[in-house]
Amino acid sequence: MAYNIWEEYIMANFHNVYPVVTNLFLFIALSYSFCIFVFFSFFFVKMRKVIYFFLIICLHSNVGWHPFFVFFCGVSGLYVKELQVGNYYICNLKDYANETCTVNYDYNKMIKLLCPINKSYEEYDDRYCFKFIGIRDRLVINNQEEPIMDTLPGIIIENLNMFDRYNVGIYMPFYVKEDITIVCTCESSKDSEAITPYLKIHVKANNSFNKEGEFIKGCDYGNNKGKHQFLTNTLKQEENFLCEINANPGEVVGMNCINFEEYTTTTTINNKKKKHQNKNNKNNFDVIQLRPPHCFSNVSISMSFLRVVTMNVNNLLPEAKYYPEVYSFPKDKKFQKYSTISYLWIPENVPHDILFYCHCNFPQGKGIGLFNINKTVES
């Protein structure tokens, strides 16, 4: 009887206390949630540059969103001028506008330069990259008489305008004929008295892919010779519509459609040397293009006499590397003269002979680069 009385007493008090306890825990949970919301809002505002910076790395690297969340949770307190991620080197002069970066040449290193967008200056173009001569009056001496393509034939430069900055991609050529140092500059603010912000790249010929000084195997329908040559087969589409390349595992092959000597002419304007497009030459990007789009990321395979299939090269060679990379964002059209240069690094493991092609589209026809990749010979 006593047990029933105590049980009824406890149950009656429990029903009275339960709403109070529930409201107390709910209040505590809401208080903590509000504090966490305020903290992360403040944290995001303070660390937004770092988050955007690493987001660009993920987008450039084509590695998806997972590294972004790992970085955000793990090392989001890191705020750097230079960063090495795998074979990517990033120089952040957007947030370090009065400083410089220095890196050594590596043909397998993809270099990314982040520059601020200064509305008072002209837009970024390849004239901001040139042979390094020296510094005078805290300014980098710009040797505009020598375009970067004369200094390093086969270099690829591109630009994406994202997140209120220039995202300049620099792909160094696999063939380098001599030791040299180049710089790519960013514009500093008008009232800045600091040195011009720049990225310096030290290039050593003995670090190039072909250390014997040989050109890269490939088809150059731009017929670039002399100081502009970087591929083995230089030819004109009017004379040769087919270029055949035999390559082995571990080698690099290339393709190009533009003649760089014809693309630019030098004129004197106000006693200053400037480069401009020669309106009378044949290098019109509306009609001269490398196909399929994003060759060598995509290549063409002939399935039969009348059937051609385009597929990703990694379906044929899973470990192959192609340069430049493929982006879902539109590229700056001022860099289109580099858009017909492409490289493919063949992996060491090639299970069987593979035949594919890319081609240059000209007003008068096509120039086809046919690439025969030999299978790996078992030892």
Swiss-Prot record:
Q: Which residues are glycosylated?
A: 98, 118, 206, 298, 374
Consequences of knocking out this gene: Attenuated parasites that cannot commit to infection, even when they encounter with hepatocytes, resulting in continuous traversal of hepatocytes.
Major subcellular site: other
Looking up PROSITE patterns in the UniProt record yields:
6_CYS
Kindly indicate where the leader peptide sits in this chain: 1-33
Concerning InterPro entries, the annotation shows:
6_CYS_dom, 6_CYS_dom_sf, Parasite_Repro/Invasion_Surf
* Record's GO cellular component terms: cell surface; plasma membrane
Q: Which cysteines are joined by disulfide bonds?
A: 91-101, 115-186, 129-184, 219-243, 257-360, 295-358
> What residues form the membrane-spanning segments?
none
Q: Where in the cell is it found?
A: Cell surface; Cell membrane
This molecule's function is given as:
Involved in sporozoite infection of hepatocytes and replication therein.
- What this protein is called in its record is Sporozoite surface protein P36
**Organism field:** Plasmodium falciparum (isolate 3D7)
